[in-house]
Amino acid sequence: MGRKGKVRAALAALLLLAGTAACGDESGPDARQPKKAGAAIRVDRPTALADQDVHVSVGGLRAHERVTVAAHAEDQRGHPWGASGSFTADAHGDLDLSRSAPRGGRPYTKPDSMGLFTAMLPRSGPGTKMIGSGDAFSYHPPSPAEQRTYDLRLTVSRKGKQLAARTLSREWLTGDVKHRKLTVARDRIEGELYTPAKGAHRKAPVLVFGGSEGGNSGEYAAALLAAHGHPTMSLCYFRCGKGSGRPDAIDMIDLRYFTRAAELLRRQPGADPRRLAVMGNSRGSEVAQLLGQRHPSVVRDVIAYAPSSKVNGPYLGGQVAWADGGRPVPTGPIPLNHVRGTVLAVAGGNDKMWGSAASARLIAARHNASGAPHRQVTYPRAGHHVNWFPYGQPGQEGGADGAVVSTSKADQAARQDGWARVLKLLD
């Protein structure tokens, strides 16, 4: 046998011994344990509406392994938001976020599969200066009119090394919902119209508008309601942008502008014209109640977030806030005895902007045209921003007691419970 032949024989012998040793290892007590392919993030709904929860778990970890789980997203300006927590896997190497709380109670204290979603804060950009200030701010992804979904990325890492990642799609609009931009020049109103597919079961149409922030802040809620089957419109009534034809102050804003929008909405496919509801937040709660009281033939139900029970003065100049057919609406308590349906007032007991909890109680003490009482729900530790939907609005605000973190967490809980009540009323 030549030199090359001897080398080949020696290598073959070594490989045979290695294979025998490996076979011997597999016959030991660990041979029956399946080999893990590595960490993996498991979710029950990779694509879900932005107001729907997702069950998140991680598998393929080592027994009792400590890892960091994080959520990441970008806002409409491309600035990153995120939240992360340290978690410990169980004896089987599994981690279920609905059963495990982050170590040290940060960024939230109790097991919650959606905890990282709602705990996100700005990671860079001007928003970081707002954290802990007590000033209100929240996450705004691209407008539903521009982008029907946004991405939320989950990652698992250990000591800075990424072990797993998964991107979830959070939907504002389902594929069968149609959108149309409304302008004062063409439609005599400024807003976004969302309609379900033709032939859909008729449901209550919903007209949504915000408060003193101006603009079209109700567009995310309107889009989600459309995804739930309701024809909706998010209406801008002031601060609608250059060239919009709308004023820049709450000054003689006429209820007929809102009823014009409501009449257009009532005619849409899938709309039950007898059941139209209006949804207003903060200063918008005033006009929502006025519409229910003064125009019951158009409006049935009213959802009033962080409400006032009275008409207040103008905002950013002027003489009176609201008008009806060109006539000023006087300041003072808003009667609700002509409302055809129900006023649902949703408030926070720690509201530093105004006494929305007291107003909610006053609203619930009043009765509609049939003699039935209106309703209210107050969340004692929540602040002014109890409005709209859960999960998709991380952010912060300070409460009347000065607390920021606890108020913001209470806001998130209020949105989850309050949104379910709103959907039930509308259905």
Predicted regions and their residues:
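Bacterial signal peptide processing site
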Residues: 21-26
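N-terminal cap/lid segment of alpha/beta-hydrolase-fold proteins
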Residues: 45-49, 54, 60-65, 78-83, ...
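Short amphipathic alpha-helix adjacent to the substrate-entry channel of hydrolases
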Residues: 217-236
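Alpha/beta-hydrolase active-site loop
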Residues: 248-269, 286, 290
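Mobile cap/lid helix-loop segments that gate and shape the active-site cleft of serine hydrolases
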Residues: 294-295, 299-335, 397
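Short beta-strand/loop motif that positions the catalytic acidic residue
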Residues: 338-340, 345-351
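C-terminal catalytic histidine-bearing segment of alpha/beta-hydrolase fold enzymes
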Residues: 370-427
